[in-house]
């Protein structure tokens, strides 16, 4: 996987340098004003997670991929160097500016990469949103994707919304399709580390079925019980891959990434 990540990162770096030299190619990086909202190092994290999609989810170059909460194309850009002309990418996000940038700079060069705005309410990121998460239906047909992934999305959502999204993920996945989602999972080990002051987030405020770092702005970071997450996956026919890939946020070592990663496969219906 390290070879895949290194190759994808070099592809992004080469394209971004080319964009700076020629006054803005079709694959230049988005402005800092858009990159600041995705968290983490834009190029490095994008290449890192595409490596996970390939290595942990078995993503093939000719498959169809859905990126939920795609932002300004952090995952889409490295995927342009992996998916072939038979492959297909779709992404949606609440940020109109981010989607406009992706359409102008990515879709224009890669027509098999499509982006849509989803006007979903979020108290922090889209307070004027038209739709509630619980009412939002992913704008895609049933069984239309081989892989669905979400990074740093469920870490900002309440349990009922997460459950609804996992239902939608199961709906749009083909039988045998895979999903990758990141979380802050609360279990005996992570809770012990929190109590000992070892974790990056203290999750000291309790809500109904979750914990948060900020009482007045709970969606800033939300931790979910691992038992709840596992139950919901089972409810919607998503078989969790074992072991889970716990992250370093809680003070665990060794770790794969910062957040906890859950991989699952949709069982045949």
From Swiss-Prot:
Statement: the UniProt record of this protein carries the keyword Transferase: yes
Entry EC number(s): 2.1.1.-
GO BP: any one term: methylation
Gene3D superfamilies given in the database record: Vaccinia Virus protein VP39 (3.40.50.150)
Keyword tags: Methyltransferase, Transferase
Keyword Transmembrane in annotation: no
Molecular function via GO: methyltransferase activity; S-adenosylmethionine-dependent methyltransferase activity
Endpoints of the signal sequence: none
Protein family membership: Belongs to the methyltransferase superfamily.
PANTHER family linked: METHYLTRANSFERASE (PTHR42912), UNCHARACTERISED METHYLTRANSFERASE RV1498C (PTHR42912:SF98)
Name of protein: Uncharacterised methyltransferase Rv1498c
């Amino acid at each position: 996987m390290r070879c895949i990540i290194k190759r994808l990162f070099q592809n992004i770096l080469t394209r971004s340098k080319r964009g700076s030299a020629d006054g803005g190619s079709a694959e230049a990086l988005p402005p800092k004003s858009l990159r600041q909202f995705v968290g983490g190092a834009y190029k490095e994290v994008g290449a890192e997670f595409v490596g996970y999609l390939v290595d942990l989810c078995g993503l093939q170059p000719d498959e169809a991929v859905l990126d939920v909460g795609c932002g300004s194309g952090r995952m889409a850009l490295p995927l342009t160097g992996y998916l072939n002309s038979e492959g297909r990418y779709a992404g949606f996000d609440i940020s109109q500016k981010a989607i406009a940038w992706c359409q102008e700079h990515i879709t224009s060069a890669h027509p098999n990469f499509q982006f849509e705005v989803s006007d979903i309410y979020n108290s922090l990121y889209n307070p004027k949103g038209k739709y509630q998460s619980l009412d939002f239906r992913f704008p895609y047909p049933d069984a239309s994707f081989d892989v669905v992934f979400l990074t740093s999305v469920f870490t900002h959502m309440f349990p009922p919304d997460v459950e609804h999204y996992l239902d939608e993920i199961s709906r749009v996945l083909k039988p045998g399709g895979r999903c990758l989602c990141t979380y802050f999972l609360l279990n005996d080990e992570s809770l012990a580390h929190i109590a000992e002051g070892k974790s990056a987030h203290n999750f000291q405020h309790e809500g109904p079925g979750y914990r948060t770092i900020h009482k007045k702005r709970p969606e800033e970071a939300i931790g979910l019980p691992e038992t709840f997450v596992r139950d919901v996956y089972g409810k919607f026919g998503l078989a969790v891959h074992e072991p889970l890939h716990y992250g370093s946020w809680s003070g665990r070592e060794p770790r794969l990434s910062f957040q906890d990663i859950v991989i699952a496969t949709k069982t045949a219906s």
